[in-house]
Amino acid sequence: SASQSAKNAKEMAVCWINLFGLQSLQTGEIGEANQREVEFNTFKVVEFVDFCCKQGFLPVVACTPLGCDLNSYVSDAFGDATLGGIERKMKERGVPFLNYRKDERFQSELSLFTDGGYKLSRRGSLKYMKILLADVQSFYETVINNKSLNA
C-alpha cells in the first residue's frame, strides 16, 4: 500500500542516517569518514572497470532505480557526494554510468518494489533489466542476445 511504502521509505532513510552517522540525506555533507569510504569505493570501481577494459570487456556501471517515496529523502547533492566521483571517472573513460535512481518509469508504480522503493520486485527487476539491456546496446551500438553472448 502507499502508506506502507511511505513508512518503509522513512524507516530506510532513518536507518541509513544512523548507520553512516549522517545528519541528513538532503545534503552533500557526508562527513570525513564517509568521504574516505566513498573515495576508496570509487577507486575500487575504477580499478575493476580498468581491468575489464584491459580484458576487452565492455563495462557498464549502473545505479538502480529508487521509488518516489525513498527518493524524497535523498537529495541530488547527496547522490553527487556519494556517486558523483564514480560518474565522473566513468565519463573520463568513456564507460557508461547509467543512473536510474530517479527514472520516471519507476516512480509511480509501487508494485515495482517490494518495500519503500529500494528492492525491486520480480516485475520491477524484469522491467529494469529490459531498460538496462536496451540502454547498454544503444551505448555500445551492439546487439546483446543469447547468440552474441555465446560467441
Task: Indicate residue ranges for each PLM-predicted region.
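Short helix/strand-capping connector loops at secondary-structure junctions
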Residues: 105-115
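Secreted/periplasmic serine-hydrolase-like ester/acetyl group-modifying domain
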Residues: 1-54, 148-151
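Histidine-centered active-site loop/cap adjacent to the catalytic His
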Residues: 113-150
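Substrate-gating cap/lid alpha-helix
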Residues: 66-101
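Extracytoplasmic/secreted proteins, especially bacterial periplasmic and envelope-associated proteins
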Residues: 40, 44-47, 81, 85, ...
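Second-shell loop/turn segments in exported
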Residues: 32-38, 73-76, 114-119
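Short loop/turn segments at strand-loop or loop-helix junctions that form parts
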Residues: 19-23, 62-66, 100-103
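Active-site segments of SGNH/GDSL-like serine hydrolases
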Residues: 49-76
